[in-house]
């Protein structure tokens, strides 16, 4: 069983959580997706909702649980491998398939480092 709190989402439902970490505002948006096209459409929807965000990092696992056939991620300008890849790792190991997540960041003036774990305190995980 997963140690991550992944919500049980109905098709079309978006789950959101917000957290402030060292003055940066993070908004996690998650949704069920059926295939890469739906995942990309969801990611674009979140980008449009937050056009002035510093970053919209994302990851999706659009196939069955545990499959990497339809998976992808992006750091969206954060240092390479510090946001999208850790998010994808969480999605691949949470035991849930057909899910996409976007972490929207509004920079608060403090660099959080490149360890990739800065998002782990976010309640949606």
Give the positions of each predicted feature.
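Detector for methionine-enriched segments
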Residues: 1, 30, 87, 118-120
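Glycine- and Gly-Pro-enriched alpha-helical subdomains that act as flexible
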Residues: 100-103, 110-125
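C-terminal regulatory domains involved in ligand/effector binding and gene-expression control
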Residues: 1-82
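Solvent-exposed alpha-helical segments within well-ordered globular domains of core cellular machineries
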Residues: 37-44, 89, 119, 123
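Contiguous hydrophobic segments
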Residues: 9, 92-96, 114, 122
